């Protein structure tokens, strides 16, 4: 069996990405305070349909995701269909794969096109860290169920007496890995210690990310892939990511205290992504359908891969596992790539993966390869800045990366690019994109 992945339909047509768009990304409780993931999803999908000038009735499938689930609307994809101009009969379902969620939604639509079930689909993801599902304690939840079934005042009073004051306190969503109890920041600290990632190197990468993102915004490169978002009640708007330190000074990063290991740690708020609100989406078509409708694709999916590792130690190594598999399926090596775009959840996580890309020992022991994935050429790496600067609405990051890579390759006259990300649960995602 060939190792090559055939990302085509039965007619041999490639899977085309014809358009991509996102909202500006905003830090928690700022511009999108009070705006749900669903509302941001509808916002970006409506604008993408308008800008692309596609008839919404032609969209045959919508796959959309969120990580911080909304109990009131668990199938965010279907609600987006009902809240936009698409046909109510449009197939729509929701996915979640932690920080790789919109990689998954894009692949699901691509695979539907590959099988011939559809010709046109829309994929993306949205997350809000400002509109959160606040829970209750287990004891209160148990009591509420019992109260609902109690018939007499005496029964209800007996149930209420079981509760203490602390049982009535709201419970915010967990920021920890369910299986281990470790937060993502604690995992980043693990990785910094395992791979001897210094505080200085982490701060330098964060400074680089903010500096490049500032230059990218000032150059106008993001103008066509980031919409202006008008915030209900429509008295204000946001048209630019608000996490970017536009006057980043490297020396200032050293002033912050470690956030997760106060005594010996190196991971700080400045070299980590903040909690972020935002949404993104892309339109995919078969190559033939795109040409028939007069679209010039911004890129094509050449290969993709998803991987998983154990969650107890250094679980954010996903790019180091998914990338070689995606490259193998594309028939390529790392040095063949024009651009490399890696999600920067934390500077420590990013630097650890970069280090392992160049490690023959890691390749032999963990990947079963006789050569390293390859040393990363920094002139190709996150050339527009990364998530440390732009922010990270969990489910929206994948399709941001895909759109950004395709547009930058187009500006450079074409080539191939890697988009890759780590994700909670020890997951990894990688996608090879080609642009003519």
From Swiss-Prot:
Enzyme class: transferase
One example of a Gene Ontology biological process annotation: fatty acid beta-oxidation
Keyword Acyltransferase: yes
Gene3D superfamilies reported in the protein's UniProt record: 3.40.47.10
This enzyme's EC code(s): 2.3.1.16
PROSITE patterns named among the record's database cross-references: THIOLASE_2, THIOLASE_3
A Pfam family assignment: Thiolase_C
InterPro entries recorded: Ac-CoA_C-AcTrfase_FadI (IPR012806), Thiolase (IPR002155), Thiolase-like (IPR016039), Thiolase_AS (IPR020610), Thiolase_C (IPR020617), Thiolase_CS (IPR020613), Thiolase_N (IPR020616)
Catalyzed reaction equations: an acyl-CoA + acetyl-CoA = a 3-oxoacyl-CoA + CoA
NCBIfam families (alphabetical): AcCoA-C-Actrans (TIGR01930), FadI (TIGR02446), PRK08963.1 (NF006516)
Protein name in the entry: 3-ketoacyl-CoA thiolase
